[in-house]
A protein has these predicted regions:
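N-proximal helix/coil linker or "cap" segments that precede and/or mark the start of modular domains
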Residues: 1-25, 35-40, 86, 90-93, ...
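Structural microenvironment flanking redox-active thiols in thiol-disulfide oxidoreductases
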Residues: 56-98, 109-124
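Active-site acidic short loop of glycosyltransferases
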Residues: 38-40, 70, 97, 131
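Short conserved loop adjoining the S-adenosyl-L-methionine
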Residues: 32-36, 125
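Conserved redox-active cysteine motifs that mediate thiol-disulfide chemistry
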Residues: 38-39, 45-63, 67
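Short beta-strand segments
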Residues: 45, 75-79, 104
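Thiol/disulfide oxidoreductase modules built on the thioredoxin-like
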Residues: 97, 107-164
Length: 165
């Protein structure tokens, strides 16, 4: 069953596939979604406040945002901080990325009847994007289709191409 879920998630994020929608409450309590950004080029950035490489990539993502936002570029961040939302909010402010969309991934932890730590993944959007490490960045085109998963250099080149520079 786990393998089937993983294969389905990998199929969801193949280039050309419609991006799985993420519709959640954002850092300000408003409901936001990827589908509402159709018509824009969207970078979906999976990160966490405790992830040093994630935080180090924000200045680069901010520079891309400044360069392309007026041309229709948005950044939709998914934080892996469900158990520490205060640290998530603090990191957003510290790193100066309030202009981006921010939601939590939706992984809920709890203790079962035997006192063992368990996870409820039913609302976990990271599973829909086959996320296994952070940071992971997916680019979505104006039609809402997956362009691909990119590192910083690849992302620069792809955005130049997409915005005709």
């Amino acid at each position: 069953e786990e393998i089937e879920k993983e294969l389905a998630a990998l199929a969801n994020v193949q280039p050309g596939a419609m991006a799985p929608d993420i519709r959640k409450e954002d850092v300000n309590g408003d409901t936001v979604s990827i589908s509402a950004l159709k018509g824009k080029v969207v970078l979906v950035d999976f990160w966490a406040s405790w992830c040093v490489p994630c935080r180090k990539s924000f200045p680069h993502v901010k520079a891309l945002y400044e360069k392309y936002h007026k041309k229709g570029f948005e950044v939709f961040c998914v934080g892996d901080n469900d158990s520490t939302p205060d640290k998530w909010k603090e990191a957003i402010k510290q790193d100066g990325v309030e202009k981006f969309y921010h939601v939590l991934r939706g992984l809920r932890s709890y203790k079962d009847e035997n006192g063992r730590h368990q996870f409820d993944r039913s609302q976990d959007v990271s599973d829909r994007y086959a996320i296994h490490y952070l940071p992971t960045k997916y680019l979505i085109d104006r039609e809402g289709k997956i362009v691909g998963k990119f590192n910083d250099e690849e992302l620069d080149a792809k955005l130049k191409e997409m915005f005709g520079e």
